[in-house]
């Protein structure tokens, strides 16, 4: 009854914490072995330091009842005990059927023991560790459930020889995850188990057949400096209306922000223009109003006036009024102060009706070639305007003009023509020479006669 209670205590203690290793080189002592020594010494489980386990181990009841074998050796030389697999027909500890070897631990010698695992704890045994090596997390449950540990005593003890380790580890590799390399050719070679500090951490994912401690270390290193994801604050800054600007006109204030085909922001005016016409709006940047403080104290540097339609600058960069600026530009000298006026003089433009009358008068000056029909018609008009007493000379004058045009070489006809013209002018009875000139200009045949 006592061994079964002790095994239950060992299983409970093995699931609580990792193994405690002995400081002596060449071996280690599991916490389960320490708890077993404490259970044998007292009825209640009391923690016993690992340095005392070597002297208390020969007094364990289940080791004394087991058959002894030639496992005693000196200086770490001798045959290494076997690490059998767990089987259902293996007898429990204390039954006398196990193959456990024991020896008294003395100075310079080490004793090792192994036993079959009981069917009550079907866990795979844990292989021996090298000097100063740590154990992987998967090995604690196996060692705490039913694995046998080796005990070393004295200062010069080492691990046993590696005679039958190769074929035993090959059978263990099928049931255990390949977290390390089990094949060692010398006991001074370090183990490939990943070292740990403090309590072992259970991996978040199940161990695969190709996972190694190097891979886990690379994953832990790569996962440590994780890049900080972009928070929503950066997106919020882009959505703020103060940070937006129209890509077309550069406006930063609009009642409604729109987007073009490429996703850029447009103000309401440019967005509507682009939507309706399919083109970008005219690049009219909003004119910023000049502050009133700049306009209030502004005065002309030449005449010191404060009212002008356009402010200009002189060669020195000083503000001048429009009149002084134009005067300096045209004449090259400053505008005299005597020319200063209180009001603003605007340009006097002529009405458009005068221009039209000038165009009509210019067209009337053009001479029109006279034909016989036009001459007769004009002569008839003139005869109508004359009095009845002068009607006959007027008709004679018309005939003389026709004859004069046809026979210009005859001097008599020319004299008759001029005499007829004199009679014509007398019959019209014009008052002043100005009136005569105006009447001549109105009739085309009179202009030809004066030529």
Swiss-Prot record:
GO cellular component: nucleus
Stored SMART domains: ZnF_GATA
Zinc fingers (GATA-type), renumbered ranges: 246-270, 300-324
PROSITE patterns, A to Z: GATA_ZN_FINGER_1 (PS00344), GATA_ZN_FINGER_2 (PS50114)
Keyword set, alphabetical order: Activator, DNA-binding, Isopeptide bond, Metal-binding, Nucleus, Phosphoprotein, Repeat, Transcription, Transcription regulation, Ubl conjugation, Zinc, Zinc-finger
Biased composition (Gly residues): 94-109
Record field: compositional bias (Basic residues): 346-355
UniProt-annotated stretches for the region Disordered: 69-111, 338-416
Subcellular compartments: Nucleus
CDD domains documented for this protein: ZnF_GATA
InterPro entries cross-referenced by the UniProt entry: GATA_N, TF_GATA_4/5/6, Transcription_factor_GATA, Znf_GATA, Znf_NHR/GATA
Chief place of localization: nucleus
Presence of the UniProt keyword Membrane in the record: no
GO annotation (BP), single: negative regulation of transcription by RNA polymerase II
Superkingdom: Eukaryota
Functional summary from the UniProt entry: Transcriptional activator that regulates SEMA3C and PLXNA2. May regulate genes that protect epithelial cells from bacterial infection. Involved in gene regulation specifically in the gastric epithelium. Involved in bone morphogenetic protein (BMP)-mediated cardiac-specific gene expression. Binds to BMP response element (BMPRE) DNA sequences within cardiac activating regions.
Protein name, per record: Transcription factor GATA-6
